[in-house]
Amino acid sequence: MTVTPMMAQYLDLKAEYADALLFYRMGDFYEMFFEDAVAAAEALDIALTKRGKHDGADIPMCGVPVHSAEGYLLTLIRKRFRVAVCEQMESPAEAKKRGSKSVVKRDVVRLVTPGTLTEETLLDARRNNYLTSFAQVRDAKALAWTDISTGAFHVMPLTALKLGPELARLAPSELICSESAENDLREVAEDFGIALTGLARAAFDSTSAEQRICDLFGVETLDSYGSFTRAEVAAMGGIIQYLDITQKGKLPLLRPPQRETENRTIQIDAATRRNLELTQALSGGRAGSLLAVIDRTITAAGGRLMSARIASPSRDLETITNRLDAVSFAQDHHDLCGALRDHLRKVPDLDRALSRLSLDRGGPRDMAAIRNGLTQSAILFETLGSHELPPLLADALNDLSRHDNLIDRLDATLVAEPPLLARDGGFIATGFDAELDEARSLRDEGRSVIARMQQEFAALTGITSLKIKHNNVLGYFIETTATHAEKMLSPPMSETFIHRQTTANQVRFTTVELSELETKILNAGGRALEIEKRLYETLKSDILACSARIAQTASALAELDLTTALATLATTDGWVRPKVDDSRAFAIENGRHPVVENALRQQSGDPFIANDCDLSAEEDAAQIYLLTGPNMAGKSTYLRQNAIIALLAQMGSFVPASCAHIGLISQLFSRVGASDDLARGRSTFMVEMVETAAILNQADDRALVILDEIGRGTATYDGLSIAWATLEHLHDVNKSRALFATHYHEMTALAGKLPGVENATVTVKEWEGEVIFLHEVKMGAADRSYGVQVAQLAGLPPAVISRARAVLDMLEKGEREGGATQKTLIDDLPLFSVAPAPAPAPAKTSDVEARLAEIHPDELTPKQALELLYQLKEAANP
């Protein structure tokens, strides 16, 4: 069946991008047809209409305005769609020159995917948007990642077990891989909410990949960037190939690849990141996370660096020391720190502005952002230059300079507040280009220019009544009376004034100068815009030529922001510099949980109860706190706060404590909290066992492990056995530093059997039948769990609480007396019978109790007391 030329063009383009929604530009709208329209209308909640017919059926259609398309794009990307953006490559007028029925040329200019976003409105300014690439060459594996909005480009070798933890660390938006690996990676991608995209195997061919990398960076060999495995080269090459596909050949500005190693940062698995709520709270948002509480950065790049440091605490002692030295310097120089932050507040997002310009998605406002950022950089250079700086800040200082020429050029070229888009014009400063100033003058002041010319012609001819007028037939012309016209028609005036028309009373002339002016006025607006666009392209080239140095400056500004932010945090919240070394120490005095402390401060003003922790261990030995105590007493908070303090220390931050000594930690593991995995048919207990198994199989002697309530999801003796064996394994095999919280009081016996285990408990106090949580950790074991009291605090009905006390008393009595088996005790409890009886009403006071209440022991002689005892015994057992 025949289709219209426009629909034929659409179908041809759609066939090339079958797996994406096609945004087909038609004037001021992007339109979608057929299945794309149905899917987009549902995803965007917009009207589904129809346009024409195909094979006898209506063609579904929907559309979105071009000016607001970014918001719709963001919605589609978040719902895991890929969008092919098809633009008009010529105007309708240009198309008609090829024939009255010619269709406007269109082509896809970009494939929008979750990992290739650059627009400011589509991205979180304080979070990286990573595109990751997994490759395998024989038995070797590698992971590469880039953020094309900032230019970051990294690669690392990988073992199969480390893919999940690395994806958890990076939190990428998209993962690309060979089509043959898609099925193997689908589950892990779904676990982390990552869009998975398969590419042809050729994209990961290491030989062609190496050439693509060399071509991108304009080098003959990769040797200057380091030594890479074939798998690493393949992973990087896959990224470049994918960017070439999605950006239609216009590759972004990427920095040379940085090779990372697995032991560069603390290994933290996904479960631990989730449990500790490092960058995201369990509720799913940023609020309530560690990042939200400690982030004092004031630039977008500084915010991204803060997030990256929390996600990737270092294992390199020199790196940690340099960061701590920088924070100490900023804290010690309070006035300087304040001055630096005042200037940093004026620093825009240089990285993303630069990236948008390189991809032709930027505009004059991005140029102004670079100008303003570099201007503040120069001021910061002067501010810091007079101080003796620690190494990290000295390196940053070196990267703040060397932009004077570009700053001068940008200052001279751009207006103070340019528009967003180059197509609007009005962004080149007056006085920069004489030709542009003339065009603008003609465009904006055409009448006054004509008036001045009229005065000049009147003076030249001596005809004061001479006028310059305009009509749609002649355009601009000089008009005078027939009497005065004779003078202008005769030499020498006739050489200047050219006769155009004679009417009954008037004679009209023109001049070469007036004709040229008319052309200039008519074309002035378009000409001014063309000149601005030409100057824009020249200025963009100048900026991109300095892109490497601008990127270095952006990194230095982010480092300054992070350093001063951490110093400000330390000062305002009373944090101290930790001692970090190669030892096996772990000694914290008056440690606090920063998130809980912040919540208390905001909600009630109550102080956080600080606690000590000493897990310092000898080489090749474990040190474990076995923590007991009631629910709600603060065990989980204590576990988490010590893990967070260790993490903060190794990211290069001060810590919430009065003193801290941390021997380097290689891994951080956490098994805290309960959750099930219904999608995979895993119970809470199964999830707990899987996470515990991962810890026992991977933790080394430099790991810090926190375990909470291992074994609680199964039968009591099963759970106790698992918890007991887990603790022994941590002590004897893993030899880790660990905090192990449990309700199994029987386990406290291990402190006397294993040299590296110490009992600790969270203290409580009973007052008039109620429990008071003191939240203090002291050495020793808890005497009971206070579960019934906690249940009462939670609001269980009084009858339930009363019955629970009775059951607990009977069970504890049976254990003490040892005269009944567990089965006998349970059989005696109506609670466990087939038809349980309701909880009994409180018993009436007995005769014995009544007589006891009347007795005054101090008034009895020994003989009277003995006689009374026999009487009471007889009354109790009639």
From Swiss-Prot:
One of its GO terms (molecular function) is mismatched DNA binding. NCBIfam families: mutS1, PRK05399.1. SMART domains: MUTSac, MUTSd. The keyword DNA damage applies. Coiled coil: none annotated. This is DNA mismatch repair protein MutS. It comes from Roseobacter denitrificans (strain ATCC 33942 / OCh 114) (Erythrobacter sp. (strain OCh 114)). This protein is involved in the repair of mismatches in DNA. It is possible that it carries out the mismatch recognition step. This protein has a weak ATPase activity. Keywords: ATP-binding, DNA damage, DNA repair, DNA-binding, Nucleotide-binding. ATP binds at G629, P630, N631, M632, A633, G634, K635, S636. The gene is mutS.
